[in-house]
Amino acid sequence: MGTVKITSRYGILLGFIALLCTIISAGIYFLTKDKIDAVIAAQQRELLLQVIPQDYFNNNLLESAVIPQDKNFVGIQKIYFAKKDGNISAYAYETTAPDGYSGDIRLLVGLDPKGEVLGVRVIEHHETPGLGDKIERRISNWILGFTNQSINEHNLSEWAVKKDGGKFDQFSGATITPRAVVNQTKRSALIMLNNQALLQQLSTQVK
């Protein structure tokens, strides 16, 4: 009987400790949530500014995102609409290259409505360190090669790595990774150019 009472007391004590830990954890979360959200928002803004220069827009890019549902936007997860005085001035596409050497490569691609690439950055990848990871800005300048490059019906063949007859450098010992990034940037630009009317419709959902 005494053993049962002791066990019950320990059970109650452990339950109380677990409840107390939960309350403390929840309190810490709510106290720090705003700070964490602010840090994440600042990081997102900084990344967006790397693909759409500030002088292109005066709206809030973080509040201008739309998740496209139309089949014409396959491979595009999110579109940010940059607007200057209410008019569309540029887009930032969150998109995924499915054919990296080690799987998906998530990209952020900035474009103006006429087909000029304003910037490209890698959001996430799993490419080989020392080879494919040169797509990262912190490791090499390769990704800057897209900035101010235009795409149109007359230069589509140029949008490939040099090994495939295009104008973009590949990496020594790692052609698959840069090829995937070039091809997905090209796809994103063509989706933008070929769906202007749909983009105008989507833009009405944001300020």
UniProtKB/Swiss-Prot annotation:
<protein>
    <recommendedName>
        <fullName>Ion-translocating oxidoreductase complex subunit G</fullName>
        <ecNumber>7.-.-.-</ecNumber>
    </recommendedName>
</protein>
<keyword id="KW-0813">Transport</keyword>
<comment type="similarity">
    <text>Belongs to the RnfG family.</text>
</comment>
<keyword id="KW-1003">Cell membrane</keyword>
<comment type="function">
    <text>Part of a membrane-bound complex that couples electron transfer with translocation of ions across the membrane.</text>
</comment>
<dbReference type="InterPro" id="IPR007329">
    <property type="entry name" value="FMN-bd"/>
</dbReference>
<feature type="transmembrane region" description="Helical">
    <location>
        <begin position="11"/>
        <end position="31"/>
    </location>
</feature>
<keyword id="KW-0285">Flavoprotein</keyword>
<dbReference type="GO" id="GO:0005886">
    <property type="term" value="C:plasma membrane"/>
</dbReference>
<keyword id="KW-0997">Cell inner membrane</keyword>
<dbReference type="GO" id="GO:0010181">
    <property type="term" value="F:FMN binding"/>
</dbReference>
<dbReference type="GO" id="GO:0022900">
    <property type="term" value="P:electron transport chain"/>
</dbReference>
<keyword id="KW-1133">Transmembrane helix</keyword>
<feature type="modified residue" description="FMN phosphoryl threonine">
    <location>
        <position position="175"/>
    </location>
</feature>
<keyword id="KW-0472">Membrane</keyword>
<keyword id="KW-0249">Electron transport</keyword>
<keyword id="KW-0288">FMN</keyword>
<dbReference type="Pfam" id="PF04205">
    <property type="entry name" value="FMN_bind"/>
</dbReference>
<comment type="subunit">
    <text>The complex is composed of six subunits: RnfA, RnfB, RnfC, RnfD, RnfE and RnfG.</text>
</comment>
<dbReference type="InterPro" id="IPR010209">
    <property type="entry name" value="Ion_transpt_RnfG/RsxG"/>
</dbReference>
<keyword id="KW-1278">Translocase</keyword>
<dbReference type="GO" id="GO:0009055">
    <property type="term" value="F:electron transfer activity"/>
</dbReference>
<keyword id="KW-0597">Phosphoprotein</keyword>
<keyword id="KW-0812">Transmembrane</keyword>
